[in-house]
Design a protein with these regions (language model features):
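Short, flexible loop/hinge motifs at secondary-structure junctions
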Residues: 1-177, 245-246, 252, 278-280
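Catalytic center-proximal scaffold of phosphoryl-transfer enzymes
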Residues: 2-3, 14, 21, 101, ...
Length: 512
């Protein structure tokens, strides 16, 4: 084999140096790409944290652009490192989730399968038990009616001929045919699952039991009479002095004597301080009114004093005059007005305003669940400087806008409500927005889509009662149907002076 010449060695060294220089350049380029990816990912995460509320209210343009930039850089990084980009494979590859076991409380029917033959299929030898494989499948059995027959035996005394018999057990509805479980199903189906009574009647008919809509309506009415003491106890608890969330929504109500409807109102009042570290149970109380006049919330809140967190509805203004109730309004409303303009006419101004409001929400996400004193300290340190800067910015930009423009109106709304809008920064118990009350009204909105209207003002009142109890169950992670079944089974004989013991968070439901 020929010896390698000095020229070949020189050429190889030169090529090696070139390759090392290229590798160094690619490594530097890769490092720059990785740093840019990390920076974009951090900005994207921050922007996502800033944007609260429904998805339609997010600043989606900026998020989409940043995601596109991030994907482009990740593809370039893959090319530099030799990784093959496959859009079907997520980055990083997600591990297979472990299936969550079924709750132990569910009843189980076991099917035990034995080998087809009692002997070995290969040699005919006898078989002995070695072990077993088990698999579970979730099944839904058709809900079944059951008739509970109560037999009270009569016994006669052999000496004095006296007749002895056990007393008849109480029924939720006197001389009624429905047990507490069936009544609870009817109430839950209508007010938690939003199934109108006529549909329930059809469902029960397909199961062979004829229950007319008028009969079901009578049961609902009777249950509301039974549960009315609970509503009073719930109202007293919710109206305890402190901080309260309030909101309202329109409902259609059928006018008597014709097929036309009028617009009534359902008011929601929520006591929920869990975001400020409180261990007290959350609760919601609903009230029905014929219209939206201010006299209704003034009557509802006659015994309340503290902070009322609501929208800027003028009907609340009378409550604030004597100083017993302090106004705190909702940043979500202020943000929504700016966002609506941003959706129609996006601009640097709307984007900047939404970004600054997003920074306020990012602070709230970090302090959610902390004690009120700690939340106040964080807001004093972080939120107040941002609010001061935002106010100055809004006032400065107002000078450049036509006062008739939609954006000027949105900015003016925030500035006109500024003291109430920024009150939360001075009170650790108060929230940045009124979403707690808005969330409580979602059940009403869903029900409104299904049964369209209340049949009367009385129907609106009984709806308010049941929305109160079911909504409070949901706030406390209590199953509404199990709760109503238990309460309807005992309330007829329950002492009136102890009715507060039957509130959703105070009873331990028996195992079913």
């Amino acid at each position: 084999m020929n010896d390698i010449s000095s020229d070949d060695i020189f050429l190889l060294k030169q090529r090696l140096a070139e390759q090392e220089a290229l590798i160094h350049a690619l490594q530097e380029k890769l490092s720059n790409r990785e740093r840019e990816i990390d920076h974009l990912q951090a900005q994207l995460d921050k922007l996502r944290r800033m944007n609260f509320g429904s998805r339609s209210e997010k600043v989606s343009r900026r998020i989409a652009q940043m995601e596109a930039d991030l994907n482009r850089l990740q593809k370039e990084s893959d090319t530099l490192t030799g990784r093959v980009y496959d859009p079907a494979v997520q980055r990083p590859l997600r591990q297979t989730r472990t299936r969550k076991p079924f709750p132990e409380s569910l009843p189980r029917d076991e099917k035990r399968l034995l080998p087809a033959a009692p002997c070995c299929p290969n040699c005919g030898g006898s078989l002995s038990y070695l072990g077993e494989d088990t698999a579970e499948q979730l099944e839904l059995m058709r809900s079944a009616f059951r008739v509970i027959r109560t037999v009270r035996e009569k016994h006669a005394c052999t000496q004095c001929d006296a007749i002895v018999q056990a007393p008849a057990p109480s029924r939720p509805i006197e001389r009624g045919i429905a047990g507490p479980g069936l009544l609870a199903r009817v109430l839950t189906s209508k007010y938690a699952e939003h199934t109108p009574l006529y549909r329930q009647s059809e469902i029960y008919g397909r199961q062979g039991v004829e229950l007319s809509r008028s009969l079901l309506s009578g049961w609902v009415d009777a249950c509301c009479r039974l549960l009315s003491p609970l509503e009073e106890a719930l109202h007293g608890y919710v109206m305890t002095d402190g901080k309260l969330h309030a909101d309202d929504t329109p409902v259609q109500v059928l006018l008597p004597g014709n097929k036309k409807t009028k617009t009534g109102r359902l008011w929601a009042y929520v006591r929920d301080d869990r975001n400020a570290g409180s261990a007290l149970a959350p609760a919601v109380w609903f009230a029905y009114s014929l219209d939206r006049k201010g006299i209704h919330p003034q009557t509802h809140l006659a015994c309340f004093s503290g902070v009322l967190q609501a929208d800027a509805y003028a009907g609340f203004n009378e409550l604030y005059r004597n100083g017993g109730i302090t106004e705190a309004v909702c940043w979500a409303h202020a943000r929504r007005k700016i966002h609506d303009v941003h959706v129609r006419i996006p601009s640097a101004l709307t984007e900047e305003a939404l970004e600054q409001i997003g920074q306020l929400y990012a602070i709230e996400a970090d302090i959610r669940g902390m004690p009120a004193e700690q939340r106040l300290a964080e807001r004093q340190r972080k939120t107040k400087p941002l609010l001061k800067s935002l106010e100055s910015w809004l006032r400065e930009k107002m000078k450049t806008l036509s006062r008739h423009s939609e954006l000027a109106k949105a900015f003016a709304y925030a500035l006109n409500q500024w003291p109430a809008l920024t009150y939360y920064a001075n009170d650790g118990w108060v929230e940045i927005d009124n979403n707690i009350a808005e969330n409580a009204l979602r059940a009403v909105s869903l029900g409104r889509k299904n049964f369209l209207f209340f049949g009367s003002d009385h129907g609106g009142e009984r709806g308010a009662l049941l929305y109160s109890l079911i909504g409070t169950c949901n706030l406390n992670d209590v199953d509404p149907e199990s709760y109503l079944r238990h309460v309807l089974g005992v309330i007829a004989d329950w002492p009136v002076n102890r009715v507060s013991e039957l509130l959703p968070w105070r009873i331990a439901l028996p195992a079913e």
